[in-house]
């Protein structure tokens, strides 16, 4: 398995994986991925099995500690010098789930955020996934009123303080 950042040629594969992982109402389009990769391809963590994209994690950087719906749709909000790494999606093809691949990418995103001196990482998820992200040091901040994207309920936050408690 190879982990790397995204380039424009990855957009069709990103779109295909996203379409397998999320319902149409929640999935980002190829056009949205093209815009995201153009603005922050170095904040996409991709795992390839040979030449096949099997899993990816992505999100931009901002000074805002709250993940909002507008962020999903507006890649120009990315601020490379921002304090917080947002996580917009964690995607793994169904045939490759339960092998720890997404976890490896989450850990890489955390390591990169630490290396870049970010305050932490922010993601939203459905209730049933809170325990999964807790394994990586994310703390449940409760129900969010900042985002309804994908009918999420919980906002999770990872800070360097969380790493000290692991």
Locate the predicted segments by residue:
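A short beta-loop-alpha structural element at the N-terminal edge
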Residues: 2-14
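Active-site rim helix/loop that mediates acceptor-substrate recognition in acyltransferases
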Residues: 24-49, 58-77
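Conserved acyl-donor/pantetheine-binding loop and adjacent beta-alpha core of acyl/acetyltransferases
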Residues: 55-90, 97, 107, 146-154
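Residue-level recognition of the GNAT/N-acetyltransferase active site
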Residues: 93, 126
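Glycine-rich acyl-CoA binding loop
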Residues: 98-106, 113
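Conserved GNAT acetyl-CoA-binding A-motif
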Residues: 113-125
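Conserved active-site alpha-helix within GNAT-family acetyltransferase domains
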Residues: 115, 127-150
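Conserved small/polar residues in nucleotide/adenosyl-binding loops
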Residues: 158-166
